[in-house]
Amino acid sequence: MFKIKKVDAHCDIPCAVYDPAVAQFAALSVVRFLDLIGEMDDSLSSKEDIAHLSRIMEQKESHAKEVKDAVATIWGDYFKEPHMEKFPEIHSLTHSIMMTASKCKQSLDRENGLKLVELVNRFAEIFWTTKEVQVESKKSLNPPNL
């Protein structure tokens, strides 16, 4: 009857199931991938090394995109006018996250990854504050231990 091949989307019901932890994990992963790339020998002397670098690069870019997707969904679907009045920075913060995630895809500069984690953590802080949840910063037990 229907010939639907593939559908990808956040539910848009709206389901009210939002959590910036996805973006936080992905941003932390971007830094980890940048670190793994930095630990590699510059010579890339074997096909195995080239394949390994290619896999890490693909994951770095995929996780940077995941940050963008998760943040865009929360920003676009969750944040409403009262939130924006209380946190007018949310628009510029979201834009900065998008731009910084793109920089992470385009370069190997670890500072971009660190900035992405910082921005996403601020986004998460605002999100949870709108839900009246007390927020505290913790270091990840996983590398890169940020």
Spans of model-derived segments:
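Alpha-helical segments in soluble extracytoplasmic regions
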Residues: S46, L53-V71
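Short, solvent-exposed, charged loop/turn and helix-capping segments
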Residues: A70-F87
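N-terminal intrinsically disordered, cationic/polar leader segments
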Residues: M1-S54, H83, P88-R122, I126-L146
